[in-house]
Amino acid sequence: MNNELLQRIIEEVVSRLKKRAESTLSLSVAQLREIEPRTLCCQYSSLHLLQADLPLLEQIAEGCADNMSVVTIHEALACGVRVKISLQHRLLPAIPVRKLARLPLEFSDELGRIIVLHPDKLLSYADVAQLKGGVLVLRRRCVVTALAQDAVGTRNVQLIKQE
């Protein structure tokens, strides 16, 4: 292989990697079922799943291998694809916080506000101090310290406890 050919190959690889780094795929749940996981991993650096429903979130948390959408999401995460899931605000009290918080997923509501899942039993000031707005979803029996409660008010963070 001569130097010119090698240089062209390197430039093509770099070009494709740059293109992938800047590309995001936005899909509905129905469209996600139809996409090939390999295509997603090779061509996109991030996936935005629009309006996920509660059964899908529960299956993602459980790692259900029967649902192709769940398999695609887990394969994308394994390949290093950033996965952002938007969901309706009304679903927040019912989502499986502990299990979803273990996965490297990003969440937002229908208005684009960031949703942070807090799986611990105690919410302290340190947990709230890093937030600037958005929604913080807590477990059912999470204790909120007084300092954290004050910080929630000053940082424009909305607290939601699970049902």
Swiss-Prot record:
Pathway membership of this protein? Polyol metabolism; 1,2-propanediol degradation
A single GO molecular-function term is: structural molecule activity
Mitochondrion as a keyword of this entry, yes or no, is no
One CC-aspect GO term: bacterial microcompartment
Main localization, broad class:
other
Keywords from the named record: Bacterial microcompartment
On the tree of life, the source organism's domain of life is Bacteria
Q: Which cysteines are joined by disulfide bonds?
A: none
Q: Note the InterPro entries from the entry.
A: PduM (IPR030992)
| UniProt subunit comment | Interacts with shell protein PduK.
What the entry lists under NCBIfam families is as follows:
microcomp_PduM, PRK15428.1
Q: What does this protein do?
A: Plays an essential role in assembly and/or stability of the bacterial microcompartment (BMC) dedicated to 1,2-propanediol (1,2-PD) degradation.
The family assignment reads: Belongs to the PduM family.
Q: What is this protein called?
A: Bacterial microcompartment assembly protein PduM
Please name the gene that encodes this protein: pduM
